[in-house]
From Swiss-Prot:
Gene: gltX1
Subunit record text: Monomer.
Motif interval(s): 'KMSKS' region: 236-240
Membrane-spanning residues: none
UniProt record similarity statement: Belongs to the class-I aminoacyl-tRNA synthetase family. Glutamate--tRNA ligase type 1 subfamily.
InterPro entries for this protein: aa-tRNA-synth_I_cd-bd, aa-tRNA-synth_I_codon-bd_sub2, aa-tRNA-synth_I_CS, aa_tRNA-synth_I_cd-bd_sf, Glu-tRNA-ligase_bac/mito, Glu/Gln-tRNA-synth, Glu/Gln-tRNA-synth_Ib_cat-dom, GluQ/Sye
This protein's name: Glutamate--tRNA ligase 1
């Protein structure tokens, strides 16, 4: 059975790179009927944040990545790690090192002066003498002295690291706390993890972890090291490129479907297909198709995907989502008029909410540039006549089509072109240019409110000359 895991450190917000590897791990486990596990790597007690841990769980809930069983917290497993450290010492596979920081710094400086790569010289590897007093030892694991550490990476291919490149690295600090590569290896083994999908910034950790697996006789999982997400210029991704924490995307008005669809295509593909439902991701995903080259973050593509999913979202669900952006529920009739028009224009829920607020709220002022363009006494008279015309209508109600037909009759009677009227009406209704069609707006806010806004703008227009 395939068992994958996601193992974030709660020292900050969960970012999209982390969520991407979680998604890949989730898809592989679910596709094969396996298990997807969550482990919180909170051994850095000084930097851990309860809020960051909470945000990780919230992000999983938001995007719908369910994990099996309970989340595992490394901070609760220190006694377990100590058992395995003691076992390695007893079996002669790890040892106490009494080298002081000053001695280690001096050794490294000497090695650099000779043009060598700084590394521990194994001086306490087979030490049997009397330990120096006043030194709290660290524990080092015995790395192989010759040969190679080899593994087949599912993305990078065959990896081969010479023993001479490795040293006896520390698995327990002088205060007794275990180090990252040791606890990761213990947890992956005890959790039964068969496949590890993670960023290729972890590639150098893999041989260190394999040393632990081999020392304890644990099976070695299959590794997939995915290239990092870069910005469009090929550099490290940052907030300046539009990248944010996962929950920041929710607050900015992105849909979880869009986030997952965007991330799955950063490092994996299935032909030329761009739009993937979760069902399609599960059907097509295979880790052997993960790309070996880095993917670039494209904000415009992200917004395009988000717009697509907004247009596909049922109006009822959309209204629920917009409550978080300060929008009030609309009547069924108004909702069915406005939402189709607004969905076609909005790239985010935040944009949609802003457009909706601009429609339902009477504008406090009129856009200066638009007013300079159309705000004259002639257009003021046209608006006044149009308001009177609206007042005479009985059947228009909340039907944009009837409003459009009746307005065409008004244009014909007065010999006006539609553009001359529509620009002024739009400014009157919204206080600015742009936005959805004026007939949808008028049908949504009702005849009385439409007339009031148009009459007010008419007075402003006429008083400018």
């Amino acid at each position: 059975m395939i068992v994958t895991r996601f193992a974030p450190s709660p020292t900050g917000n969960l970012h999209i790179g982390g969520l991407r590897t979680a998604l890949f791990s989730y898809l592989y486990a679910r596709k094969t009927g396996g298990k997807f596990l969550l482990r919180i790597e909170d051994t850095d007690l000084a930097r851990n944040s309860h809020d960051a841990t909470k945000a990780i769980i919230e992000a999983f809930d938001w995007v719908g990545l369910s994990y099996d069983g309970e989340a595992i917290y490394q901070s609760e497993r220190f006694p377990l790690y100590k058992e395995y450290i003691d076992r390695l010492i007893q079996e002669g596979k790890a040892y106490y090192c009494y080298m002081s920081k000053e001695e280690l710094d001096a050794l490294r400086e000497e090695q650099r002066s000779r043009g060598e790569t700084p590394r521990y010289d194994n001086r306490y590897r087979d030490f049997t003498g009397t330990p120096p007093s006043g030194v709290a030892p660290v524990v080092r694991i015995k790395a192989p002295l010759e040969g190679y550490i080899e593994f087949e990476d599912g993305v990078k291919g065959e990896m081969k690291i010479g023993a001479k490149e490795m040293d006896d690295y520390i698995i327990a600090r002088s205060d007794g706390t275990p180090t990252y590569n040791f606890v990761v290896s213990i947890d992956d083994a005890l959790m039964g993890v068969t496949d590890v999908i993670r960023g290729d910034d972890h590639l150098t950790n893999t041989p260190k972890q394999i040393i632990v697996y081999q020392a304890l006789g644990f099976p070695i999982p299959k590794f997939y090291h995915v290239p990092m997400i870069l910005n469009p210029e090929g550099r490290k991704l940052s907030k300046r490129d539009g990248a944010m924490g996962v929950m920041d995307y929710k607050r900015a008005g992105y849909l979880p479907e869009a986030v997952l669809n965007f991330l799955v295509r950063l490092g994996w593909s299935h032909g030329d297909q761009e739009i993937f439902s979760m069902e399609e991701m599960l059907r097509f995903f295979d880790p052997k198709d993960l790309n070996s080259s880095a993917s670039a973050y494209n904000q415009e593509k992200f917004l395009w995907l988000n717009h697509h999913y907004i247009t596909q979202t049922p109006n009822e669900r959309l209204e629920e989502l917009l409550l978080e952006f300060g929008c009030q529920p609309l009547s069924l009739g108004v909702r069915e008029i406005l939402y189709p028009a607004l969905k076609e224009r909005a790239k985010t829920l935040a944009e949609l909410a802003q457009m909706l607020q601009e429609i339902v709220q009477t504008p406090s002022e009129l856009d200066t540039k638009m007013l300079e363009k159309v705000g004259n006494s002639e257009n003021g008279e046209i608006l006044e006549n149009y308001a009177l015309f609206l007042e005479s209508l009985e059947s228009a109600g909340e039907n944009p089509k009837i409003l459009e037909e009746e307005t065409q009759a008004f244009l014909d009677i007065h010999g006006l072109k539609s553009g001359k009227l529509f620009q002024s009406v739009r400014l009157a209704l919204l206080g600015k240019g742009g936005g959805p069609g004026i007939f949808e707006i008028m049908a949504a806010i009702g005849k009385e409110e439409s007339m009031a806004r148009i009459q007010k703008a008419s007075e402003i227009f006429k008083n400018r000359n």
